[in-house]
């Protein structure tokens, strides 16, 4: 048999076998494209040296395995799934001790198309549709950590519940809504501890030459019910490894729910990018004055090596 005949026989014998691609990530896909499986993960290491400058706490000099994630994602016809755990920042208690694997994404989804729109519904734990800085994956952040208000009580990153996203076919606009009852963290949630959270986010792209040259504007709203009687907001400064909580309201009783909104904008022009976000959060109390928290973040960067 000639070489061409052998190649033809091999092609015919393997036409129904799954396809394995390694561009960027390893991915296994069925020959007809009806199902896929992809292992995912990331490792990020952080070194930090802080000067507390007379604040009454000790300086900090140390390292941290900031993220060590492992998981998988894929699709089965119109259904999708994703599960990812973090082995680095797992199970932190009030003393910042790590004990168990922390669950990040854990959901199933269903997607469909109608007219020129796409609809995706998720059940499980995924990103809360609210702020921009909490929605951006850590894989694409310029810095190791997010702004102080992001991924916290006033702007949560992931929670467990139901989410829906409606987008145009060309992704020029998007509307997202979610109903959640807290983060799974190590496997469960308690509605009495966190209450109900309703969130809504919309965004549109007024300018888009291609995926590397665009401007996006967005806004979000979040309402949290009063199932939990206590409120507390605290956050580290500078680094996740610095365990001094300079921002700390302590626990305030009589919590009666909260409302928050966020406005944001981002732009990409080749190797240059910029983004900004403003957040306003108000916590209501039965027996104390309301707590108003505002925050903003501005970021800009340029890739010297030409990436976008």
Question: Across the structure, where does each feature detected by a protein language model lie?
Answer:
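Cleavable N-terminal export/targeting peptides
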Residues: 1-15
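Intrinsically disordered, low-complexity segments enriched in polar/charged residues with Gly/Pro
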Residues: 13-15, 57-59, 252
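Extended acidic, Ser/Thr- and Pro-enriched interaction/regulatory segments
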Residues: 18-23
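Outer membrane beta-barrel
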Residues: 24-226, 293-308
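Surface-exposed beta-loop-beta
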Residues: 54, 192-292
């Amino acid at each position: 048999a000639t070489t061409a005949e052998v190649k033809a026989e091999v092609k015919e014998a393997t036409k129904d076998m799954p396809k394995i691609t390694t561009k960027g990530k390893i991915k296994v896909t069925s020959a007809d494209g009806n199902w896929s499986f992809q292992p995912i993960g990331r490792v990020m290491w952080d070194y930090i040296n802080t000067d507390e400058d007379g604040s009454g706490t000790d300086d900090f000099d140390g390292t941290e395995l900031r993220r060590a994630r492992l998981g998988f994602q894929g699709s089965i016809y119109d259904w999708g799934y994703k599960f990812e755990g973090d082995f680095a920042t797992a199970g932190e208690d009030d003393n910042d001790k790590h004990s168990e694997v922390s669950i990040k994404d854990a959901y199933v989804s269903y997607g469909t198309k109608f007219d020129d729109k796409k609809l995706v519904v998720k059940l499980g734990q995924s990103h809360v549709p609210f702020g921009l800085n909490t929605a951006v994956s850590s894989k694409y952040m310029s810095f190791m950590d997010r702004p102080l208000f992001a991924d916290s009580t006033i702007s949560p990153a992931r929670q467990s519940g139901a989410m829906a996203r409606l987008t145009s076919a060309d992704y020029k606009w998007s509307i997202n809504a979610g109903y959640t009852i807290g983060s799974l963290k190590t496997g469960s949630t308690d509605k009495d501890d966190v209450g109900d959270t309703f969130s809504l986010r919309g965004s549109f792209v007024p300018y888009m030459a291609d995926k590397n040259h665009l401007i996006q504007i967005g806004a979000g709203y979040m309402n949290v019910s009063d199932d939990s009687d206590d409120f507390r907001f605290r956050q580290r400064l500078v680094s996740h490894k610095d365990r001094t909580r300079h921002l700390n309201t302590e626990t305030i009783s009589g919590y009666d729910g909260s409302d928050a909104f966020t406005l944001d904008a981002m732009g990409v022009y080749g190797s240059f990018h910029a983004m900004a976000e403003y957040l306003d959060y108000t916590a209501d109390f039965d027996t104390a004055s309301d707590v108003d928290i505002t925050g903003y973040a501005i970021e800009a960067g340029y890739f010297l090596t030409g990436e976008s």
